[in-house]
Amino acid sequence: KRMGLEYVDIFYSHRVDENTPMEETASALAHAVQSGKALYVGISSYSPERTQKMVELLREWKIPLLIHQPSYNLLNRWVDKSGLLDTLQNNGVGCIAFTPLAQGLLTGKYLNGIPQDSRMHREGNKVRGLTPKMLTEANLNSLRLLHEMAQQRGQSMAQMALSWLLKDERVTSVLIGASRAEQLEENVQALNNLTFSTEELAQIDQHIADGELNLWQASSDK
């Protein structure tokens, strides 16, 4: 009613609720589809094990799990480490990565400090997830290396970060935010080069440290 819609395309369980049995969550998701309030259902920030269980619970209702929305980017690779993409592929579930640009870190905006016109400067430690304390020397070193790699590829850092995600056929799409049309146009150009050399991938794996940016780690670790 508040949205003024008769139904939504996708209804998400946005993260694990330890106080609610998964059977109850699955039932609520299934009811949303069966009552015509949602066309499909998805989950977000679920571990591979919880994802598998949700797939099986929804099957009992004859409802497919359409999509998983994990936080995933070059500085936040819990999806790789956990094997989540394999779980999704094995069950025919799509993946839409949110925070693909690490809330702006992977745009190059913070390479030389915190700009005065940035959200981090305006809100400081109030920002959900991205705070000044995350501009560690390790993260800054990773950003500098990524910036150099992007230049060598003829891309902006943001474009390369999106390309890195979309090169994997198991990643259906990425969820980006843009405050200006120019940002959207720049991001879309990431599709022009989704190919990475073996050397580039090895360099990323060896030298880019995990930035500890998993926004809902408490959920995805369960």
Where are these regions (language model features)?
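Active-site groove signature of glycoside hydrolases
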Residues: 1-20
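Amphipathic, coiled-coil-like alpha-helical segments
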Residues: 210-214
